[in-house]
Amino acid sequence: MLDLRKTLILLVLLPVFCIPAHAQRPDSFWRKVVHLISDPSMELDTGAVYQPAPRWSVAVSGELHQAGTSMENKLDYVFTPDDGAGGDSELLDASSSIRLMGGVDKVIGLQVGYGNLSLGWNHIVGGDRASTNTSFSFDYLAPGYALQLQYFDFRRPIDYEMKIALGHDWGYMEDSGKTEKPGRMTTFIADAFYAFNRRTFAYSAVYKGNVIQRRSAGTWLFGVKYLQGLVEYDPDDVLSDLWFGMYRQDTRQVSFGGGFSYNLVPFHRQPGADGKGLRNLTFNLTAIPMVTLFNQFSSTMRREMEEGDPVLVKNVINGKLHVNYVFKAGAIYSWDRFFVGVSGSYDRYNYRGSTAVPEDFSDDEVEFGRIYTSGRFCRWSASLKLGVKF
């Protein structure tokens, strides 16, 4: 993730801070690039979408954010009593459900942008003092195209709920609490959207504020999403006792889908010749069902040995096709050079598969078969943003 963070920063710094300076030279390569960045769509109907000259913008934001995962497991195993009586073996199964969730974080943020580009940084305030947070975002939001990169790294105690049915006559266990040591929850998301109606609809009008939607319009969207998620906690913590010392879960997914986005404009007042007097209120609702074509889940387990160091075992599950969901809603009010926006989003990513339990985990009484795993990563956020254009 460290290399990913450096790459993300370079992606933003080069176009945002270098291009505007070089763009002053006539007919230069950089001038063509900045034109593509700041005014990528020459098909805009100016009666429906008002795109002012590109400007620098600065926005501060407050956000509520929560991310977590829930997982269900089923384990097949053969139990042979080791009581000297020669009892018959039994084919049994055990099951568990685990829910890991970070708390609702209060986040402050700063976004700096030029034209359709912006770089964001967020930081958790208040809450658990053991929490640490790194959150970066890079957005390229044009009227008809969108590319958004988000990276979250939260380290904090993890709330858990677990239910375990062991099979045979070993009973049932239920527990909930918080890990003693901070766990880590990391997410990298890359979203790309293409709007089929690029003449009268501007996706960036609500979520970037760089253009103004003059009248209501909607469009069908095509979207691509990449997700890489990680949940990790201390191997000596209570959670690692659940399933063979499992203390780390990773998922990687690539999804494609189509949906619909609509901008509703209940009020608009055009600016005067001096550029002042702009008043605009726009609402957006976006829904994109997606099919996950690449769906990989891996778990890392630690096996304590009677002698020597613990053994680490990593199992990789290549899951089946799944339907995931992306929902987003927002509103923005613009007046002259200022704007205030609210937005909310909900992302859900499913995974499912099975893997064989390593032979080292079996003993004289218990021979393990396969673990069947299904689960989901979820993330929601709600934010308020206040910005100004220079």
Predicted stretch roles:
Residues 25-29, 37-55, 141, 197-218, ...:
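Short loop/turn motifs that connect adjacent beta-strands in outer-membrane beta-barrel proteins
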Residues 45, 137-252:
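Outer-membrane pore/translocation modules
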Residues 52-58, 106, 115-117, 134, ...:
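Outer-envelope beta-barrel architecture signal
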Residues 58-66, 112, 121-125, 140, ...:
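Transmembrane beta-barrel strands of outer-membrane/channel proteins
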Residues 73, 77-95, 233-337, 346-355, ...:
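Outer-membrane beta-barrel transmembrane domain signature
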Residues 93-96, 122, 133, 173-181, ...:
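Extracellular loop and loop/strand-boundary signature of outer-membrane beta-barrel proteins
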Residues 116-122, 144-149, 198-202, 268-270, ...:
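Repeated loop/turn-to-beta-strand initiation elements of outer-membrane beta-barrel proteins
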Residues 190-192, 376-390:
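Outer-membrane beta-barrel "beta-signal"
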